[in-house]
Amino acid sequence: MHVTRDFSHYVRTAGEGIKHIDLAVEGVHCAGCMAKIERGLSAIPDVTLARVNLTDRRVALEWKAGTLDPGRFIDRLEELGYKAYPFETESAEVAEVAESRFLLRCLGVAAFATMNVMMLSIPVWSGNVSDMLPEQRDFFHWLSALIALPAAAYAGQPFFRSAWRALSAKTTNMDVPISIGVILALGMSVVETIHHAEHAYFDAAIMLLTFLLVGRFLDQNMRRRTRAVAGNLAALKAETAAKFVGPDEISQVPVAAISPGDIVLLRPGERCAVDGTVIEGRSEIDQSLITGETLYVTAEQGTPVYAGSMNISGTLRVRVSAASEATLLAEIARLLDNALQARSRYMRLADRASRLYAPVVHATALITILGWVIAGASWHDAIVTGVAVLIITCPCALGLAIPTVQTVASGAMFKSGVLLNSGDAIERLAEADHVIFDKTGTLTLPDLEVMNAADIPADIFELAGRLALSSHHPVAAAVAQAAGARSPIVGAVEEAGQGVRADVDGAEIRLGRPSFCGAEALVGDGTRLDPEASIVAFSKGAEKFILWVRQGLRPDAQAVIAALKARNIGIEILSGDREPAVKAAAHALAIPEWRAGVTPADKIARIEELKRRGARVLMVGDGMNDAPSLAAAHVSMSPISAAHLSQATADLVFLGRPLAPVAAAIDSARKALHLMRQNLWLAIGYNVLAVPVAISGVVTPLIAAAAMSGSSILVMLNSLRARSDSREIV
């Protein structure tokens, strides 16, 4: 019977002519596995990306559209000795919980056997220095074998299965030397017992398995902790929504069945499943994890809502603008996934070292055995020493040194409101010693404020707001928002470059340029009140009013600038805005170095000048308007609105009103880089010390297992320090 495989549900478009799929891969435990999988998949023609994420054992694949069947990737992984299937968050979590429980059972069996075998070994050890009869010693050895052999057969399954799959595929992984070491120790012990020898190694073999299982169990649980942020984000995703299928009829349908333009009902206590705009109702919503706004947002007609937001109080009708994988939540999840799977410079270095290290280890173990035999040692002693070399030199710590830090640091940055858009952004940001800020939309809030709204009569301001709804100009949008306008004036006409007008109760009303409204005489007053203001006029018959609109500084901008100065970071403003506006912002923030009226070319020239002086420049600017200067800087960062997240071009982006993510990201990056270097030195130092000691024969396989597991756990624990909070911004 011919069986076909359809993976179309799991394949998505990653770019023009490029397809993407995520596969879950079983049996990935170390950097050697990662390197082998990536090499094997990259060798397939037309594959443009093959990247393994060790924290969730997922491989991301991209290839030229129309050239490959995704089933070929699964077949190739099977040839390499790994079982693979399309990645789904829920099923991956279930599989990981099942594996964690299995590891715990194996650990329990191994630990129980270890305690009993150790108790049986005590009489043997004491008998070797007293007068124990050979028959008594053999009896204790056979009892130990009766406990250790079945226990090892069960508890060693995680290693034996992985090694068998690798050998069946005519390859090796780091479970192969571990399995060889355990089997050799048990086999030698049985042979020694049969020949009535004084020494057997059942205690060492089963304790070796116990140490290895402790290390693997802790390693898996630490990986789950590092992925906690991504898991929390996935938990925000609602799978169904109440869709209106008639004027007063709703149906609970999967999110995949919802399209833009549909209307859904959002009840109190529910998570929003779509992006859209409220068309009816009033409520408070919590969207802190989506947009960075820590306070509840009042949602009413015209308010945008996003998938993952929690509806707190009222009932809302929402017109859908995006659903499923097109939502802001999905875009944030993709950016976070990219950050977790990214390859930094240090990670590429560690991968290369791990890949070269494995064959060297195997060769070293073989040479050690032969060297000891040539030197006159027995095969027994030589093999024991070789087993110790195989185990102690496993490059697990080296393989975990960088990805664990990057995963933890990415999660810490996400909690600070920062998303990574580049693989080596953390390392480059940590090196930054000079920050250039754009003013408009960066140091200032992206939304405009009507500064003199309180001075305008309420009825006039409401009328101006309703008229502003008929204009597409951002200043008009600010007036409409400030006035709380919801119903536009019927019959309003917009005149390009001038403003908008309409007739109300027989009187003509106008909103726009002062000349359009006949209010030129009032402009001087507004300019004197605030030289930075954008001027908009409103007229109703003979009544004339001036509204002055400006962008306010971000609420914490002054504190953030002070914090950056305290970190010995140079700061300046480069803005294309008018000199009075830039000068006022620089004065308010105590930034002595600023330039106004600069062009994109001027910004690039200034960045290049600083780079020639040896500065590492962080450019913080609008992701769309400052694209050239963002690309020219050593590293770049953009404040970006929810609507424009998918268009982000900077190395890092942040959502929300505060500027604090800039300082928090620098702190996190510097700490992460410090921990990466620390971990590399820990891993390298461990191997430099461990290999000669193991070759010398001083270390038993038992001590080797404890040292190898301990080095990996030490690296993981050190990496978790990247979660700690950044320095307080005051």
Swiss-Prot record:
Q: Which residues lie on this side of the membrane: Cytoplasmic?
A: 1-101, 163-168, 224-352, 401-676, 721-730
InterPro entries documented for this protein: ATPase_P-typ_cyto_dom_N, ATPase_P-typ_P_site, ATPase_P-typ_TM_dom_sf, ATPase_P-typ_transduc_dom_A_sf, HAD-like_sf, HAD_sf, Heavy-metal-associated_CS, HMA_dom
Q: Where does Mg(2+) bind?
A: D622, D626
Residue numbers on the Extracellular membrane side: 124-138, 191-202, 376-382, 697-701
Keywords (alphabetical) are: ATP-binding, Cell membrane, Magnesium, Membrane, Metal-binding, Nitrogen fixation, Nucleotide-binding, Phosphoprotein, Translocase, Transmembrane, Transmembrane helix
Is Metal-binding a UniProt keyword of this protein? yes
Residues the entry annotates as binding a metal cation: C30, C33
Q: Name one GO molecular function term.
A: ATP binding
Residues in domain HMA? 19-85
Active site as annotated:
D438
- Database matches in SUPFAM superfamilies: Calcium ATPase, transduction domain A (SSF81653), Calcium ATPase, transmembrane domain M (SSF81665), HAD-like (SSF56784), HMA, heavy metal-associated domain (SSF55008), Metal cation-transporting ATPase, ATP-binding domain N (SSF81660)
Gene3D superfamilies referenced in this protein's UniProt entry, alphabetically: 3.30.70.100, Calcium-transporting ATPase, cytoplasmic domain N, Calcium-transporting ATPase, cytoplasmic transduction domain A, HAD superfamily/HAD-like
Where does the chain cross the membrane?
A: 102-123, 139-162, 169-190, 203-223, 353-375, 383-400, 677-696, 702-720
**Keyword Cell wall biogenesis/degradation applies:** no
Topology versus the membrane: Multi-pass membrane protein
Question: EC number(s) on record?
Answer: 7.2.2.-
User: Main EC class of this protein?
Assistant: translocase
One GO CC term, this protein:
plasma membrane
Give compartment(s): Cell membrane
Under NCBIfam families, the record lists: ATPase-IB1_Cu, ATPase-IB_hvy, ATPase_P-type
Q: What does this protein do?
A: FixI is a pump of a specific cation involved in symbiotic nitrogen fixation. The four proteins FixG, FixH, FixI, and FixS may participate in a membrane-bound complex coupling the FixI cation pump with a redox process catalyzed by FixG.
User: What protein is this chain from?
Assistant: Nitrogen fixation protein FixI
